[in-house]
Amino acid sequence: MSRDLVFGFCDPRFKKVRDLFARSVESGYEVGATLAVEYRGEMVINLWGGYQDAAKTRLWQEDTLVNVFSVTKGIVATCIARLVEEKRLDIYQPVSNYWPEYGCNGKENTTVYDLLCHRAAMFGFREPVPEGQWQNWPLFTELLAKQAPYRSPGESQSYHALTFGWLAGELIRRIDGRSVGQYFKDEIADPLALDFKIGLALTDLDRCADMLM
């Protein structure tokens, strides 16, 4: 790959950073990447380069989208914080105050605080989940609402890597009526002109980078 495939700008003070970025792309270590850095309130680096697909046929663009995985948990928590700010949600109240079906099988006293702090002991599914149904929101939220926690909620930490989205997202939906993706878009992303999605529209797929494992 040529150095010409690295685009954007870099403050001359940070030329070494640009050189490292270019080297990682040119060497093939990164198929494609983007890097933005603010220093003392000023954007000093905004670089992108390489390709956004495994076949290396589509150049990485300034607006290429990437899957940020669990970074989304922080975005969802921001939506929760907005509901708290609006006094529509009290994190010290039981989840079942907002999602009645959740309050069963040992989860009756689980608070929103427990859920947000990954202390709800609901870090997995006790029953096998159907393949190819990950987008079936009602199915998975119902499974979580009905099952018993793995241990007593609120007593220990356990990262809810896969279940947090359904748990927190359903809490938002029960309070507001909108999906977490729509709530974030309407209340946070669009007003702040953020190009961040929770759920992609078909029109965005062409600018979404492949996931390479």
Question: Model segments located where?
Answer:
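Short, conserved catalytic-motif segment at the N-terminal edge
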Residues: 5-68, 90
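Short, conserved phosphate/pyrophosphate- and ester-handling motifs at nucleotide-, phospho-/glycolipid
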Residues: 73
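Active/ligand-binding-proximal structured segments within catalytic/core domains
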Residues: 76
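Short, surface-exposed loop or secondary-structure junction motifs
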Residues: 42, 53, 105-213
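Juxtamembrane transmembrane-helix termini
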Residues: 79-88
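Short, glycine/proline-biased beta-turn/loop segments that scaffold the active-site neighborhood
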Residues: 91-105, 190-192
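Short glycine/proline-rich turn/loop motifs
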Residues: 1-2, 56-62, 146-151
